[in-house]
């Protein structure tokens, strides 16, 4: 069986539905993990061709990549409510960077499967997702790629269905958004209007409210199997239409309370959208049994707390190790 550091791989890594990465599954200490390799960023470990100036530039870019990922994953692991799946490890082997997370035994649902559920169950699942996003936003972390593929559904030991948010690699902190020349990565169908304007070259503030718009689109699909309405002759995507000033049409099939909530979440002005916790509280009011403490809402995974997550050397050399245990070097 092929090995990757401490992991025994279940098969070759693949790029199916993976964007700028390849992924697969592996086992470590008897537990199953999802493993992702970042394709675009490579450390010049064996670069004997580049000039000293070019090599220094490559190393600096890698250091920036590492710093951003560590900060992002640290914030995720410190703030997750258990339904935003924590990162087990972020590490490098030779020139390639990887992360690992506990494998989720998902139900393989898409939004059309969710839409077939009773309305009360859809509301409960949306509340779980909103609470998970609120836990990220508590640390001012933006997921930036909320879409059906990045929300998995699974059964808990008690038999409830819960939701798990995955794939944070398009994410960033509000304090460190993509700069000039950097790309916002994600699915255009769920881009907020401000993300679209940023791509068009406008100067805009990118905040956690980006995720609220994406949730508005996603929740609309969960309830109706359809995207919010807009003029498809003028725009291809919801956020694009909103960025051009169009008010998205929320389905008349929705109950009035859900309809009004989605209208707020899809507001063209990010400052007028509710926070993720406000979305959760609205849904909790609609489903009185929903509380952040109940296991049918927040099903804590058994992935490690942030002080168990390691960043392996040679990403961090022992002589420069931070006192923060998230940056503790390990051995591969």
Where are these regions (language model features)?
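Conserved activation segment of eukaryotic-like protein kinases, specifically the C-terminal portion
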Residues: 181-198
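ATP-binding glycine-rich loop module of kinase domains
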Residues: 21-70
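Catalytic-loop of the protein kinase fold
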Residues: 137-154
